[in-house]
Design a protein with these regions (language model features):
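Conserved N-terminal segment of class I S-adenosyl-L-methionine
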Residues: 1-86, 90-92, 104-107, 170-172, ...
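S-adenosyl-L-methionine-dependent methyltransferase catalytic module, highlighting the catalytic core
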Residues: 13, 76, 90, 101-112, ...
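Residues lining the SAM
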Residues: 94-97
Length: 224
């Protein structure tokens, strides 16, 4: 039951929706915090490929054991030749581009890695996050000193279209699972004497935006 609920959270929802138990190839851009192990536990048939600046960012041998390959690289350098083109069914970029001064170009360079019919999911703090109160664990965009650029759906949807993508959904992230869990998470932390974290309130207050798009053509506009 718990694993099913986890599949309904934003990071995993569209993997569950489009692939379920079927095999698929995933390029996880930002593969720290044991993301590989968490993903493979929910989707055993997934072929997991990860990218991160530092392979040791909250990863261990159990994570690397379930990866097909890990690419340790600085995304801002735009050097992605080592990653095969037309190889992936899904690219996941969850809270990555706000840390990159050229996040738009990173997206543009990664789109060729998708198969035709493949999907990309991008999530990031929206403009509204700059107006939310400051809080431990980040509730305001500027709470995190590594945030360098604010993106919007108005910028990303046309960008993706120019790369041969069609947007399926976009807007403010409002996860029903997290919304329902908010009061319980707050009470649980208070009882345990722990600090409340800003990310507990992201869905309630509209901190994050997302874009889900599907590849229908290559970057020249010709079906690949």
């Amino acid at each position: 039951m718990l694993n099913f609920i986890r599949k309904l959270t934003p990071k995993f929802y569209y993997l569950h929706k489009y692939f379920g138990k079927k095999p698929f190839t995933l390029l996880d851009v930002g593969a720290g915090n044991h993301s590989a192990s968490k993903t493979k536990k929910l989707f055993p048939a997934c072929l997991y490929y990860g990218i991160d600046l530092d392979k040791n960012f909250n990863n261990d041998e159990s994570d690397f054991a379930v990866m097909e390959q890990f690419y340790e690289m600085d995304l801002t350098r735009l050097e992605f030749d080592v990653i095969p083109d037309h190889a992936f069914d899904f690219i996941r970029m969850t809270h990555i581009i706000e840390h990159l001064h050229n996040g738009d170009e990173v997206i543009r360079k990664l789109i060729p890695k998708l198969k035709t019919g493949g999907y990309i999911y991008i999530e990031y703090p929206g403009q509204k996050s700059t107006r939310l109160p400051s809080m431990y664990g980040t509730l305001n965009f500027y709470d995190d000193p590594t945030h360098v650029r604010i993106f919007s759906t108005k910028e990303l949807v046309p960008l993706l279209k120019s790369c041969g993508m069609i947007t399926i959904r976009s807007g403010t992230r409002r996860s029903l699972v997290f919304l329902l869990a908010t009061p319980f998470r707050v009470i649980f932390n208070v009882i345990r004497g722990k600090k409340l974290r800003g990310n507990m309130f992201w869905d309630l207050l509209g901190f994050a935006e997302f874009v889900l798009a599907q590849k229908v053509a290559d970057k020249q506009g010709v079906a690949s």
